Amino acid sequence: MTLNIITHPSLAPLRHGFFTRKGGASSGVFSGLNCGLGSSDQREVVMLNRARVAEAMNVPALASVYQVHSADVVVVHDPSDAEGIKADAMVCNAPDVALGILTADCQPVLFADVENHVIGAAHAGWKGALNGVMDATVEKMIGLGAQRENIVGVIGPSISQKSYEVGAEFLGDFMYEDDQNTRFFANGQKGKYQFDLPGYGLHRLRAAGIKSAEWTGHCTYSDPNLFYSYRRTCHENAADYGRLISTISL
């Protein structure tokens, strides 16, 4: 099956893609392009899926970190620089290195300064976003020669507000950071709230002073044919879930 890849004009002409679950070799609950080695899927099948992504990106291998919901960023010049490192973002100014981020509701964020040949990729769930992983990625890119006013950031498929119910304690964490963050919460049912993760992500990107910030507009929870979703898996009491991959290279 052909791979289904979402791209964004803001990142052109760089090779990049927010890969959907279409076109992979996994089966069962992982059916499709599961790229998560942390899942209980067969390792050899996941490696085959990752090889298909690398081939689509025209690189021999993908650079990916051991994601832990942190704000830590790694500078990568070769895929081996990221292997096994606990972090949630990477930046690079070397050609033909594809940075790969795994998600299943969290925000995959791809960054580029095309003029100065610097790229970045971040895994930004609520905790990473709140703790500044996107801001940290921008700063690391600047350290590699990017200019803030040239950097574009694009948020890929993530869970949307209508599907992201949270409790009062969650709201409190965001209020503690900035009481203006209430604008990213809508009243839900039975004392719950609906959190706008992509809206908050766009806010943090724009506050970082970069050239532009966009979201592709895709909700992982509401489209099981295209996307894996951790929260949907929990609601369905499924055994496990796949991970989507988003990549960018110079």
Language-model features and meaning:
Residues 1-250:
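Active-site microenvironment for binding and transforming phosphate-containing groups
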